[in-house]
Structure formats: structure tokens, C-alpha cells
């Protein structure tokens, strides 16, 4: 049995959006939630953010549900495997990893790729590009 670490926030605005974050580090997940909430507040968006810690939880969350944006922030091969598995199940995938996987992200045509550490500016740019469909940077 798995436990989905669910943290939901709603911001009232013109349209709603659902985002899920997969990161095995609780403090990094919380930081990303804060960055996304700040971005949503500035854009006056209604938003729901859910979080999970690994592929098994993410796969369960993706099953039978369409998310607006899926964010995978896992290092190494685990990140590659998770991003590769999540990509066919999501319209927009943001992958956060190290430079070694940048070429693979480009080949996979993920919505956006950037390197750790995560900053508010990087996250906001990734969200904007993913929504506009601008591809990997």
C-alpha cells in the first residue's frame, strides 16, 4: 500500500490548474509548492498542487487522471526512469535533474528541463514555458 503525500492549495482566479510534483526530498517538495503558489498568486490562477515521493506514488496519481503539469525532480537514473514513464501519461512534463540528463530530456521532448538547485525564478520560467508549449531549455 502506498501513501500519497497530498498537499492541496486553491487560489481563486480565472481558470483552474492541477499540478503534481514528484520529489523524494520533503523540503524540496515544500519549497517547490511555495514557488508554484507564488507564481499562481501573481497570475491570479486557481490551482491545486499534489505531491508524491516516488514513481509508484506518481503512477497511482496519474492513473485515470489528467494533470495539467507533472513535475519530476529526481536525480540520476531514477529521475530518467520516472520522467520516461510519466511522459506518455502527461501533456506537460517538467523534469528537474542534473546536466547529465539534459540531452535525454531534449530527445524526449519534455516540456521543460532545468538543473538543480530549484529556484523561484527557474520554476516560474518552467511553468510559463510548459504552458506555452515552448519545449526544453
Residue positions per predicted region:
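Short, Lys/Arg-enriched N-terminal segments with co-localized hydrophobic residues
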Residues: 1-16
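Flexible, charged surface loops at secondary-structure boundaries
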Residues: 13-14, 62-67, 87-88
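Conserved acidic carboxylate
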Residues: 23
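Two-component/phosphorelay signaling modules centered on CheY-like receiver
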Residues: 26-50
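Alpha-helical elements of the RecA-like P-loop NTPase motor core of helicases
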Residues: 30, 60, 103-104
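Acidic, metal-coordinating helix/loop segments flanking the phosphotransfer/catalytic sites
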Residues: 51-69
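CheY-like receiver
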Residues: 68-136
Amino acid at each position: 500500500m502506498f501513501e500519497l503525500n497530498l498537499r492541496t492549495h486553491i487560489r481563486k482566479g480565472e481558470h483552474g490548474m492541477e499540478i503534481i510534483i514528484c520529489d523524494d526530498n520533503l523540503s524540496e517538495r515544500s519549497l517547490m509548492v511555495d514557488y508554484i503558489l507564488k507564481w499562481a498568486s501573481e497570475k491570479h490562477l486557481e490551482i491545486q498542487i499534489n505531491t508524491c515521493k516516488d514513481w509508484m506514488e506518481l503512477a497511482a496519481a496519474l492513473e485515470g487522471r489528467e494533470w495539467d503539469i507533472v513535475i519530476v525532480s529526481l536525480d540520476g537514473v531514477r529521475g530518467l526512469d520516472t520522467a520516461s514513464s510519466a511522459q506518455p501519461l502527461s501533456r506537460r512534463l517538467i523534469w528537474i535533474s542534473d546536466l547529465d540528463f539534459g540531452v535525454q530530456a531534449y530527445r524526449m521532448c519534455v516540456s521543460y528541463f532545468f538543473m538543480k538547485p530549484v529556484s523561484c525564478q527557474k520554476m516560474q520560467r518552467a511553468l510559463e514555458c510548459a504552458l506555452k508549449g515552448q519545449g526544453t531549455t
